Every structure is written in C-alpha cells, then in structure tokens.
C-alpha cells in the first residue's frame, strides 16, 4: 500500500552505511567550509542564461564525451540486467527512476566540478560519469534498505485477512 502509488520510488533516501559504530575523534571540518560551499552554490546560481525572443531560457546542451557515453551505456546495460531479473515491481520502478536520475547527477556533478575549476562545461566527461555511477549506486542501496525495512513491517496476506475480519472496535480482555 505504502509504495503502490509510485510516490516512494521518487524519493532519494540517504541511509548511513555504518558497518561499525562511529568512533569519537578530534577531526573538525575546516572553519571556512561553509563559506566555500556557499561560494560554489552562489557561482552556479549567478550563471547568466541566454533568453530567446519570447524571454524564455535557451537551453545549453552538454553532450557526453565518447568514453563517458560508453561507460554510461555499460552501466545502464548492467542495470537493465538487474531490472530484468527483479520480480518486485516496486524495486523495478526504483531502478527505472534511477536511470533517469543518473543523467541529472552527471549534469550536476559536471557543473559543480566546473564551478570548482576542475573542468570545463562544454561536455560531460568520464570522471563525472564515474562519480554519478557511485552516487546512483549509493541511492540504489539506500532504496533497497528502505524497501527491506518497509517489507519487514508489512503484514502477510493471512495476517491482513485476519485484521480485515476484526470488528471496528473490540477489547483484548
């Protein structure tokens, strides 16, 4: 019921992958990290956009380099095999959404790298695709963990039948 309408498939879950309990330590983030992050976001936001004669934003298309495209296709073919073998419709739906998200991740990562002066913004390169794959795999694993938790709490069909037979109000005494 909770995932039958497809809404939950659209959520990117963040689940810590802690194999061991976290250890306390004295490591601190640099004091200027927040300012650096704000500067990156501000530079992205301040980008000039070309407008067409109707005042609408003119899209700027970033194509993939050949090696980046090859790697992305390789990942998608492997991901499709996982999808073909999956019997749970909810999981299949999650996989299909992630195939769309990975393209968006590529664009976000490439522009973030450009903002940090690591690359240009004329195309999406292999390093960006590799990072987008890692991010997508993380979100896949998190979604599978969430589905596992939801399924643990789901009633079996026999349990649901019994619950449905109960009167609207009753006591356990």
Which stretches of residues belong to each language-model region?
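Phosphate-handling catalytic cores of nucleic-acid transaction enzymes
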Residues: 1-173
